Amino acid sequence: MDGINTIVNIRSNTMNFEQLIRYTLEYGNQLRYYHWQTPSYAQHEALGEFYNKLSELTDGLVESWQGRRGNITVDQGSVELVDYTDVETVIESAESLREVYEAFKEKIGYGDIQNQIDEIVELINHTIYVLRLK
């Protein structure tokens, strides 16, 4: 999962919806791994809630997109998971995901899809806030 290249692709208008969803699915796997590895119960709970809600919101986003544009096809590939090191690394990864969604939102013209992206960004912001609590 390479957030920097993903952001570059979004900004250069080369990322399509399928790639956004693939990135989100990869991120979800990484998030679940962080959830299992964190030594903090509060972070464990926050990351579990983030994973579950992100999965639900992504499902709705894909279904809405497919209602407009037809079924998507996500490229196959491998997912490389990174071990949990500290909460700041998790926060940075969430900030990268937020940036990807905000950039993608700017390039689409569907209000309903933009609203669903706003919900995902709101979830990310809430999770970052909770993870920063001591």
Where are these regions (language model features)?
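Short, Lys/Arg-enriched N-terminal segments with co-localized hydrophobic residues
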Residues: 2-14
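Acidic/histidine-rich alpha-helical segments that form the ligand environment
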Residues: 78-132
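Residue-level recognition of alpha-helical structural elements
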Residues: 13, 20, 43, 109-113
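Hydrophobic stripe of amphipathic alpha-helices that form coiled-coil interfaces
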Residues: 34, 38-41, 61-64, 68, ...
